[in-house]
Structures are given as C-alpha cells and as structure tokens.
Design a protein with these regions (language model features):
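Fe-S-dependent hydro-lyases/dehydratases of central metabolism
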Residues: 1-428
Length: 428
C-alpha cells in the first residue's frame, strides 16, 4: 500500500516496493530527441557488444525530431543525418510530427502504470496519464536503449491538493505558477509530485499535461495524476494495450500543499526564475516585443482555441510580433479545420510547423539583445530564447493572446468578457 509511485513500482516488480528503495526495473518505453540522441547513441555503442549491437526493442525505442526541425544549421542537419542512419540500422522509426511529449501520448505509447524514461527533463509530462515518467541524462538513456532496464531510488512523494473551481480568466497554467511559487524551484528535488483534489478530478487530459509538465520546474522526479474515466476516454482509439488502473492506497506523503483555485487570478512568472510569480496586475503595461504561443506546456488544441477566441477579428499590436507553434501534426490539422490557424494568420501572427519552435532559442523566433517576450513556455531562464539580456515572462494562452493585441502584458479577462458578449449577441 502506498503512493501512486509506489503502486506502479510494486506492480512492475511483483512485490511491495517502498520509497527509498533502490530497484532495477524494466522500462516500457525509451525516448530521445534530435538534440539528446547523439550522446545516447554514443553510450549505446559502448554497450553494443553486450547487447548484440541491437537496441532492446525497436518498437519500444523512440527517437523524435522536434527541437530543431527542420534543421536550421549545417551542424543540426549533420546530427540529424547521423541519427537517421542509426535509426535505420536499428529499425527505429524517427517521429517528425511534433513535440516528443505530445506525440508519445498521442500515439498511444503512454498508458497508466507504465514506466518511461526519456532524454528530456519534461518527460514527466506523461504522468498525466498515470505513468511514472522521468527525464534522464543521455548516458542513462543509451544504457536503457541497450538493456531495456534502468535503476531508480524510489522517490518520496509530495502531494499537491487542489480544490475549488477555476475563476473567470484563470487556467491550469495559472495554477501551475501558484504551485511553483509555493513549492519553489527546488522544493521537490528527487520527489514525485502527485496532484489530487476535486479540481484535478475535473480537468481535461490537456490541462493535466500542463500540471505534470511543470513538475520538473519544482525539481520533481515525476509528476503523476491517478488515472480515471477521463484518462480512459482520452486513450480510447489511441491504444489497444491493456493497462492497470492503479491508484494510491493509504499513501504516506512527505509533505502536502493545499491550493484553493477559487482564490487565484491570472498569474505571471517573471524573469529570471519560474518561481518569481506575481499576479498579473503587478506587471501589466510592461512592453512586449514577442509573444510565443506553443510548447509541450501549452501548444495543444484547447490552448489554441482560447487564444484564437481572443484574437478573432482583431489585429496584433504593431510593436509586437506573435509566433504560434502547434505541439503536434494532429493538433495542427485540427486547428486548421477549425479555423484557428486562419484566425492567427489574419491577426498578423506567424504560424510555424509543429515542434518546439523558439523555446530553446535555436531558431524560429529568437530574441535580440534587450527584447522582452511573453510566452506559454515552462522556463524563463536567462538566455533561454536567445540573447542573455533578453527577458522572458511566462503566462497562460489567454494572457499571451491579450498581450499580443495590446503590445504589453495585459489581463485577458477584459478580452474574454468581450468575446463572451459577442458570442451572446450572435446567438440572440
């Protein structure tokens, strides 16, 4: 009996596992992307003789091109050529349809009770589906490619209980900022974070992804939500795999945080740290050069819908540019069918191919010296999007859209109210 993390490890090993134990387990999936695969391949090569020169299972080994796709430099193109060669050699399919943390779940590779390791810190996103998923260094991932196994010290668990209801203009992203503010950027170091409470139980899978994605911003080893009927409905048609619907049983949490969502308002994470969180009213009127809507945190269809609703029929401020990057091909096509992409383009935004976009500061919208951006990313570290003197503010998709219209950080509630009024008039 224990936390969801303990239940997953116990189920996997066929015995009771407790926090603090060091265990070796078989993993269900191993993933790396275009910037982390080269070192993982090097580590794999060193073990190639022991593994017969083959990955443990090519159907459970995944390489995703998302960080710099299409290649923006000769160096990136060369690395991608070499990764493709390795993938052909190992019969691994290279996925090129969006961000790894969106594409892996969409393809049904993530199911409740699974253990997944990825060469990216935001692999914890998959915990929204009831999996234990964590980021590892490329060397560890290379070993996992070779053996299909890895070791863990089963982490202790922090519980974040969220109750109440979302106020007007407040979204899952705003709640994550409040979490990071309370817990701190290192308050959950090597801890699992389990999100519970009445509000969590009513969230969509997309909103749950936002929560679990930012577990690492508190130092979390993993972020998890107990799977339920909402999880099963989302997975229906995506996988035929059987999976256990595990849940905590008399869990012993190291610490419990309580958040009443009803008391929140739109929040902003100010540079240079994610836990530098303030109510939006404290920073309105700060001029913004670029707005970026997308990433594995907020590049999903509901995020695009919120922003498109605010931008519909309007024009982006002339002093501000806007970049929109859907998280996956599936989302891109759905947004195109629903007219969201047309709305963005008519408003003056640049819509880019699915991927990470300017999130890591390599291409597709990097910042010049002294510029400011408002983005839906998960990080605002110095130099994250370009020049180290540039500043990055983080907000919700609604805040991003409102800011793009005003040319400065803006409270989205005014625009949301206008949109609601216009819809009401249209139906009368």
């Amino acid at each position: 009996m224990g936390t969801l993390t303990e239940e997953i490890f116990s189920h996997k090993l066929g015995r009771t596992v407790e926090q603090g134990e060091t265990v070796i387990v078989e993993v269900d999936r191993v993933m790396s992307h275009d910037t982390t695969s080269p070192l993982a391949i090097q580590a794999f090569r060193k073990l190639a003789q022991q593994s017969g020169g083959r990955v443990f299972n090519p159907r459970r080994s995944h390489i995703v091109f998302d960080h710099i796709i299409p290649a923006a430099t000769i160096a990136a193109a060369t690395l991608q050529r070499d990764i493709r060669s390795f993938a052909r050699e190992q019969d691994i399919t290279v996925l090129q349809e969006g961000i790894c943390h969106q594409v892996m779940p969409e393809r049904g590779y993530v199911v409740p009770g699974s253990i997944i390791v990825g060469a990216d810190s935001h692999t914890c996103t998959y915990g929204a589906l009831g999996a234990f998923a964590t980021g590892m260094g490329s060397t560890d991932i290379g070993v996992a490619y070779a053996t299909g196994r890895t070791w863990f010290r089963v982490p202790t668990t922090i519980n974040i209980e969220i109750t109440g209801s979302l106020p007007f203009g407040v979204y899952a992203k705003d709640i994550t900022f409040e979490m990071v503010r309370q817990v701190g950027v290192d308050g959950a170091n090597y801890r699992a974070i389990e999100y519970t409470g009445s509000l969590v139980e009513g969230l969509s899978v997309s909103e749950r992804f936002t929560f679990c994605n930012m577990a690492i911003e508190m130092g979390g080893k993993a972020g998890l939500i107990t799977p339920d009927a909402i999880t099963q409905a989302w997975l229906h048609g995506r996988t035929t795999a059987e999976y256990p619907m595990l849940s905590p049983r008399n869990p012993q949490y190291e610490r419990v945080f309580h958040i009443d969502a009803s008391r929140l308002q739109p929040m902003i994470a100010c540079p240079p740290d994610v836990n530098n969180v303030v109510p939006i009213g404290d920073v309105t009127n700060i001029g913004i050069d670029e707005v970026f809507l997308g990433t594995c945190t907020n590049g999903r269809l509901d995020d695009l819908a919120i922003a498109a609703g605010i931008l519909h029929g309007k024009t982006i401020h002339p002093n501000t540019r806007m970049v929109v990057v859907p998280a996956s091909r599936e989302i891109y096509l759905a947004a195109m069918r629903l007219g969201y992409l047309e709305t963005f383009i008519q408003a003056g935004a640049t819509v880019e191919n699915p991927g990470c976009g300017p999130c890591i500061g390599r291409h597709q919208g990097v910042l010049a010296p002294g510029e400011r951006a408002l983005t839906t990313m998960n990080r605002n570290f110095t130099g994250r999007m370009g020049d180290p003197t540039a500043e990055i503010y983080l907000g919700s998709p609604a805040t991003a859209a409102a800011t793009a219209l005003c040319g400065h950080i803006a409270d989205p509630r005014e625009f949301l109210a206008q949109h609601a009024t216009n819809e009401q008039h249209a139906t009368n």
